[in-house]
């Protein structure tokens, strides 16, 4: 055992143990068939280079679970993946190099994206190590590596073989800024201020009609006008034809139950496409397709003189033209929900494009999800709500570069689509030829490789398969997925869909969901509000362990939590307390302490060990259910109050002056309870617990130790020890309140309990600094009047010049007689200078003292299960 420094230096300790853990493979997954697996499907984060506090919360939760399960003897696989592909990296590379991706070859652009991603990953890995996360870095993976997108392509091919994947032309969400299709889950609706335009359509052979729209720029794409069939304003007009102003095409008035008659004029134009409702009407009524918006968000040749205008430019110019032509009746402000790209916040368009899709089997997804244990369980309802609201299949093709290639070729002569064979993957169709050679339909060997790539969620949605060794290993559900509630509709949804489609299994046994992290002021974190906190900032000012504890105590998993600096400060104070306990313990235990045989425990020892065993069970129950906040509070309460405040105070006398057997018993119980505490705390505060553990007679790392299993002890002895601790704490509290030194001597202490039972007063007497006697029953104590306390502000103004004499008469009177007169008459009367004066009760108080049956003055204290008489 090495000497424990007087104070704990987190900077030094954290750097030391980060290096030691990495060098010693403390967190390696062994693949031990004798132990149960605990595999975590870690979310591969997008490598932004910045592990923000929201990311850190999720990784804290995963790390708490990983460390706890190692203590439980499980073979833990805590991998680290990186979700590398995607538009943000492409945009950043374009900005950094001042290029457009089409300015260079696909290979060169991808190479630059990889270089940028590597730099970002390195920065995030350093933050993860700083925070003490215990990943097995031998199981790190990157979705941009060939070995990963090989399996992404393999799963794509297997799903295509099972008819989950298909190619078709269909209206899709399209981001004109990103110039790619995006899935429903990547569209976020925002409430924005817009304008409602009232536009007149001239009747072909009938009266005009007025429609209301927020998108006059889509007039060249108008294919019909729709009204509610029950709207009397349009009775007899269904089937009439009208000319679209400025652009001239004729459209028909149709009836549909989905038209909202209360919106605008009750008549709406149907365009291809303004929104999903337009798509539904277009399909249901077999309308023409008149696309007018280009992939980059401009109008095409159908817009005539407005061709080439951006959407916003076209809106303004067409509205102006309508006003000049007399077709624009009025404009009014309106609130509208606008679907926007979640990456760049650009309003999406709906374009009809040939794309690759994955079928969404809502029933299969929900049935699979029901077999997963959700923490908290109401998070399943979020998945259910999203799934039931799905209207379209998942469009998985993207018109980008930095992503997993879709393994397909098109025959240049006959249009046949050829998918790669599983033996070919990984494959890049823009560089590689299909193994089939000639086209099986026409015999041509002229192939055009698919340039579209896969949605990045196609990568990350196979993460549980990849970490579990699929396809080399038969897939079995991993134990845990931890993720934020904001990506239930994406990562959770897609993973359940894909795993069920490929393996007919659930992806994970348990799904643990975390919420968002708000600032100390309760608002969403932002630099403009001044409440933004980076994890590194907390570590630098306090420590990684303090940050980790604050994350655990912020709230229950699933709920949004508030980052609070006071929790960080409290954690730092607790760590100081823990270090002081370790320092004290190290002065009394040695290498032989753990091996003491049959220690002669006293009641206090039995009590602390029983409490420790109970706490270990409670904390384990909480950890099993991912109640990290409750688990940490329970163990901190035990360490601070039971172990430090109560037990250490009780045994100090034995440790310093006790006989060898008594001292050894206290040393052993102290070692057992402290070493157990360090193990229970280690998932939350890995650095200080490892440093403290290294100063105890314990083997290896605390993180590879076993979950504590202290002897439960004798129940009766535990109850006696509990009472001893209560009495000691009660007397200690009284001394503190009275400003007395805690080591102040007492003449004696009498403890009255309900039943006659032996109580070990050895430690208690040492602690309270006086002999302790145990009595059965209720003490005989009475309040005895011993004096008066004059209320001069009440008495003086009434008696004025006689006040002094009245005070003298009160102070010289027998307090007991004064009390009796008050009880009888409600006041006191005196003769002063031949005059009777009446002294009201508010003019003085009777001072009473507690007296024991012996007549001695005594202090009466109430403990939970005893009445304590203190004789000074």
Curated annotation (Swiss-Prot):
InterPro entries: aa-tRNA-synth_I_CS, aa-tRNA-synth_Ia, Anticodon_Ia_Val, M/V/L/I-tRNA-synth_anticd-bd, Rossmann-like_a/b/a_fold, tRNAsynth_Ia_anticodon-bd, Val/Leu/Ile-tRNA-synth_edit, Valine-tRNA_ligase_type_2
Record keywords, A-Z: Aminoacyl-tRNA synthetase, ATP-binding, Cytoplasm, Ligase, Nucleotide-binding, Protein biosynthesis
Residues binding ATP: 527
GO MF entries: aminoacyl-tRNA deacylase activity; ATP binding; valine-tRNA ligase activity
Short name of one Pfam family: Anticodon_1
Cell location: Cytoplasm
This enzyme's EC code(s): 6.1.1.9
Motif ('HIGH' region): 45-55
Short sequence motif named 'KMSKS' region, residue ranges: 524-528
Annotated disulfide bonds: none
GO BP term, pick one: valyl-tRNA aminoacylation
Keyword Zinc among UniProt keywords: no
CDD domains the UniProt entry points to: Anticodon_Ia_Val (cd07962), ValRS_core (cd00817)
Record bears the keyword Protein biosynthesis: yes
Main location class: cytoplasm
Similarity field: Belongs to the class-I aminoacyl-tRNA synthetase family. ValS type 2 subfamily.
Function: Catalyzes the attachment of valine to tRNA(Val). As ValRS can inadvertently accommodate and process structurally similar amino acids such as threonine, to avoid such errors, it has a 'posttransfer' editing activity that hydrolyzes mischarged Thr-tRNA(Val) in a tRNA-dependent manner.
UniProt note: domains: ValRS has two distinct active sites: one for aminoacylation and one for editing. The misactivated threonine is translocated from the active site to the editing site.
Name of the protein described by the UniProt record: Valine--tRNA ligase
Species classification: Archaea, Methanobacteriati, Methanobacteriota, Stenosarchaea group, Halobacteria
Gene it is expressed from: valS
């Amino acid at each position: 055992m090495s000497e424990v420094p007087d104070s704990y230096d987190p900077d030094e300790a954290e750097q030391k143990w980060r290096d030691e853990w990495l060098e010693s493979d403390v967190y390696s997954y062994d693949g031990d068939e004798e132990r149960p697996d605990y595999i975590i499907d870690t979310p591969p984060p997008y490598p932004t280079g910045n592990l923000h506090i929201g990311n850190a919360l999720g990784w804290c939760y995963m790390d708490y679970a990983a460390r706890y399960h190692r203590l439980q003897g499980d073979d833990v696989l805590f991998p680290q993946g990186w979700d590398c592909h995607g538009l943000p990296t492409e945009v950043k590379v374009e900005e950094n190099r001042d290029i457009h991706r089409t300015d260079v070859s696909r290979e060169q652009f991808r190479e630059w994206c990889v270089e940028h991603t590597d730099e970002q990953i390195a920065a995030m890995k350093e933050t993860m190590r700083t925070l003490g996360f215990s990943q097995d870095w031998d199981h790190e993976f990157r979705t941009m590596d060939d070995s990963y997108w090989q399996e992404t392509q393999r799963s794509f091919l297997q799903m295509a073989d099972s008819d989950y994947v298909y190619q078709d032309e269909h209206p899709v969400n399209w981001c004109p800024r990103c110039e790619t299709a995006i899935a429903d889950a990547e569209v976020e609706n925002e409430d924005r201020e817009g304008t409602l335009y009232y536009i007149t359509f001239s009747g072909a052979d009938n009266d005009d009609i007025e429609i209301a729209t927020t998108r006059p720029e889509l007039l060249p794409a108008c294919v019909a006008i729709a009204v509610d069939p029950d709207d009397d304003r349009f009775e007899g007009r269904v089937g009439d034809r009208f000319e679209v102003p400025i652009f001239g095409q004729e459209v028909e008035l149709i009836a549909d139950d989905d038209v909202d008659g209360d919106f605008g004029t009750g008549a709406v134009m149907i365009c291809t496409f303004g929104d999903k409702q337009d798509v539904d009407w277009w399909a249901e009524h077999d309308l023409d397709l008149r696309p007018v918006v280009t992939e980059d968000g401009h109008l095409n040749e159908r817009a005539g003189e407005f061709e080439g205008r951006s959407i916003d430019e076209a809106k303004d110019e067409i509205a102006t033209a309508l006003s000049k032509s007399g077709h624009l009746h009025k404009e009014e402000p309106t609130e509208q929900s606008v679907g926007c790209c979640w990456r760049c916040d650009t309003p999406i368009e709906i374009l009809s494009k040939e794309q690759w899709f994955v079928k969404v089997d809502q029933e299969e997804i929900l049935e699979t999800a029901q077999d997963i244990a959700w923490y908290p369980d109401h998070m399943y309802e979020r998945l259910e709500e999203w799934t039931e609201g799905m209207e379209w299949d998942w469009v998985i093709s993207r018109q980008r570069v930095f992503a997993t290639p879709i393994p397909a070729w098109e025959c240049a002569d006959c249009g046949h689509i050829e998918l790669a064979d599983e033996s070919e993957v990984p494959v890049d169709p823009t560089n590689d030829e299909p193994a089939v050679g000639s086209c099986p339909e026409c015999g041509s060997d002229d192939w055009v490789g698919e340039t579209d790539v896969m949605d990045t969620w196609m990568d990350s949605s196979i993460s549980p398969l990849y970490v579990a060794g699929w396809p080399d290993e038969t897939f079995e559900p991993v134990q845990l997925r931890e993720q934020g509630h904001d990506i239930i509709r994406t990562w959770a949804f897609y993973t359940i869909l894909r795993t069920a489609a490929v393996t007919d299994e659930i992806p994970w046994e348990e799904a643990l969901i975390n919420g968002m992290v708000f600032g100390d002021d309760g608002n969403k974190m932002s630099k403009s509000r001044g409440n933004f906190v980076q994890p590194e900032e907390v570590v630098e000012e306090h420590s990684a362990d303090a940050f980790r504890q604050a994350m655990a105590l912020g709230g229950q998993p699933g709920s949004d939590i508030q980052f609070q600096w006071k929790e960080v400060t409290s954690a730092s104070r607790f760590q100081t307390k823990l270090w002081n306990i370790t320092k004290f313990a190290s002065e009394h235990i040695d290498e032989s302490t753990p091996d003491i045989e049959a220690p002669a425990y006293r009641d206090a020892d039995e009590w602390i060990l029983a409490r420790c065993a109970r706490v270990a069970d409670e904390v384990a129950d909480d950890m099993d259910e991912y109640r990290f906040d409750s688990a940490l509070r329970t163990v901190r309460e035990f360490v601070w109050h039971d172990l430090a405040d109560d037990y250490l105070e009780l045994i100090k006398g034995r440790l310093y002056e006790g006989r060898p057997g008594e001292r050894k018993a206290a040393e052993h119980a102290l070692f057992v309870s402290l070493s157990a505490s360090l193990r229970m705390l280690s998932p939350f505060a890995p650095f200080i617990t490892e440093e403290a553990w290294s100063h105890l007679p314990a083997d290896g790392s605390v993180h590879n130790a076993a979950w504590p299993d202290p002897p439960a002890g004798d129940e009766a002895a535990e109850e006696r020890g509990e009472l001893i601790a209560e009495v000691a704490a009660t007397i200690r509290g009284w001394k503190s309140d009275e400003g007395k030194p805690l080591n102040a001597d007492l003449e004696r202490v009498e403890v009255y309990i309900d039943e006659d039972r032996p109580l070990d007063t050895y430690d208690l007497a040492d602690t309270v600094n006086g002999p302790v006697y145990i009595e059965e029953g209720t003490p005989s104590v009475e309040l005895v009047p011993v004096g008066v306390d004059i209320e001069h502000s009440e008495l003086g103004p009434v008696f004025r010049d006689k006040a002094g004499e009245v005070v003298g008469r009160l102070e010289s009177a027998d307090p007991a007689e004064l009390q009796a007169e008050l009880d009888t008459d409600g006041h006191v009367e005196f003769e002063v200078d031949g005059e009777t004066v009446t002294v009201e009760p508010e003019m003085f108080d009777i001072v009473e003292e507690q007296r024991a049956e012996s007549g001695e003055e005594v202090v009466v204290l109430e403990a939970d299960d005893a009445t304590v008489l203190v004789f000074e």
